[in-house]
């Protein structure tokens, strides 16, 4: 995919999920930091059957933090305690020969040990960490709600910092601290922002096979942001080196997402 970085973009229509829906979740207070990397470097992490997705001649690596809220099984209610936690992940961008776009997770840090153990058992690279959300400025009365009111709340409030602090367990374990200040109320709708966030599934290696786990959600309400603080060791720990500040910095109050039935990817289809 190529395009004019400054041109407006159209958010793709969210896909219909193959039944059954196996999880309903809310991803809130999301911070997206992205750096360019070479397609060749990204290719070394791709599972069989998919290749790196490219925008403006580059692959991209992302550091993304958010609050998981009310995650539940099927269409049921959120699971108490286990369904709400902080997550910070490092991800790449993938594409199948048929055009299906997704993400490939290099790591996903979470602060709920049972969640980490359960997801690692099926091949998703979760890591148990201590994660704290960076709070708003002292005295801020911001209260971000679920649904459409999230966008309205963000659009009428003063700028506030939001970010995450990650400490993996162990004296020499990787750490990350990042905070951004959203530029409100102007929405970010450029092609790169859409390319990095309009992702409706993940590619991964599960039990010896490549599979795609689909999800669907409405368009992220996106805002550009300025880096307030950044000290990251998670990307390096995943095996990728980046230099300088991130080229894309975004904030979103959040979306509701649902996950559907996985499907296998034909490993011989790449070329």
Residue ranges and their predicted role:
Residues 6-11, 79-91, 134-139:
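Short, surface-exposed, charge-dense and proline/glycine-enriched linear segments
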Residues 1-74, 218-223, 227, 234-235, ...:
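Hydrophobic, proline/glycine-rich low-complexity stretches
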Residues 53-57, 75-76, 85, 114-116, ...:
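Short, surface-exposed linear patches
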Residues 60-110:
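Extended, compositionally biased
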Residues 30-31, 89-271:
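Internal, well-folded beta-alpha domain core
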